[in-house]
UniProtKB/Swiss-Prot annotation:
Binding sites annotated in the UniProt record for 3-dehydroquinate: E47, F48, R49, R83, R213, S232, Q236
Enzyme Commission code: 4.2.1.10
Metabolic or biological pathway: Metabolic intermediate biosynthesis; chorismate biosynthesis; chorismate from D-erythrose 4-phosphate and phosphoenolpyruvate: step 3/7
PANTHER family noted in UniProt: 3-DEHYDROQUINATE DEHYDRATASE
Keywords assigned by UniProt, alphabetized: Amino-acid biosynthesis, Aromatic amino acid biosynthesis, Lyase, Schiff base
UniProt catalytic activity: 3-dehydroquinate = 3-dehydroshikimate + H2O
List of catalytic residues: H144, K171
Descriptive protein name: 3-dehydroquinate dehydratase
Source species of the chain: Neisseria meningitidis serogroup A / serotype 4A (strain DSM 15465 / Z2491)
Family: Belongs to the type-I 3-dehydroquinase family.
GO biological process terms, semicolon-separated: 3,4-dihydroxybenzoate biosynthetic process; amino acid biosynthetic process; aromatic amino acid family biosynthetic process; chorismate biosynthetic process
Top-level taxon of the source organism: Bacteria
Subunit structure: Homodimer.
InterPro entries for the chain: Aldolase_TIM (IPR013785), DHquinase_I (IPR001381), Type-I_3-dehydroquinase (IPR050146)
Length: 254
């Protein structure tokens, strides 16, 4: 039975699927403009994709920009994500820098949720999860497959592995090569929901997988990602259109 997670009065893992909007900006000026553009959009969680920053190699600058996001949206749950190149992100970096950055963000207590890549070394991942939770920050463990959709059993196994590492939220994103692959992801989501004790987040990327971003409440995915001003992953739907569609699916349509 999945337990829910409450972050700034937002309940993750129960009720309607929550909408996260990624913040994608290269510098302070663009970040300020994007924050102004998204502030009135109908989203539940803001995800700061710090790997898109030109200054992503400076921990101090990343902290400064994260503070800007926190100050601009004080009442929204803040998910900090630094996606590395190997998992589809914009910034290639060493494990040492990656975990040093995560530790700095955790110690700052600026984010409410922190994204940690599952396959970054089990010991380091477990330490980061424990450190986050010690500082009152939820740990979201994640994995991304940008070239394929693993079999259902493997998807479920990876989500279970995240939970075993102590994750508060378990997330996987896969790339479909066919409509059947989308069904595989949805079936895995349903199975994982039955087994998981923590909220799960799943998506099939690209245009083919877009339906998975709308079906979370039915199959068990707790968060869906919708674009504000710029997509951070293939197949993201605009936040306003995503909210309208989710409302329609929940309430029924004439």
């Amino acid at each position: 039975m999945c337990s829910c997670l409450v972050v700034k009065n937002t309940v993750i893992g129960s009720g309607r699927t929550k909408i996260a909007v990624p913040l994608v900006a290269r510098d302070a000026a663009v970040l300020s403009a994007v924050l102004d553009q998204i502030k009135n959009l109908p989203f539940d969680i803001v995800e700061f994709r710090a790997d898109f920053l030109e200054c992503a190699g400076s921990i101090g600058e990343v902290l400064r920009h994260t503070q800007t996001v926190r100050d601009a949206l004080p009442d929204k749950p803040l998910l900090f994500t630094f996606r590395r190149h190997g998992e589809g992100g914009s910034f290639p970096c060493s494990d040492d820098y990656y975990f040093e950055l995560l530790d700095a963000l955790i110690e700052s207590r600026l984010p409410d949720i922190i994204d940690i890549e599952l396959f970054s070394g089990e010991t380091a991942v477990r330490c980061a999860v424990a450190n986050a939770q010690k500082n009152g920050i939820a740990a979201l463990l994640c994995n991304h497959e940008f070239h394929r959709t693993p079999p259902q059993e493997e998807i479920v196994c990876r989500l279970k592995q995240m939970e075993d590492c102590g994750a508060d939220i378990c997330k996987i994103a896969v790339m479909p090569q066919s409509a059947e692959d989308v069904l595989t992801l949805l079936s895995a989501t349903l199975k994982a929901k039955e087994l998981a004790a923590k909220p799960i987040v799943t998506m099939s990327m690209g245009q083919t997988g877009a339906v998975s971003r709308l079906a979370g409440q039915v199959f068990g995915s707790s968060i869906t990602f919708g674009s504000g001003t710029q997509n951070s992953a293939p197949g993201q739907i605009g936040v306003s259109a995503l909210r309208a569609t989710l409302d329609c699916l929940e309430n029924g349509a004439d």
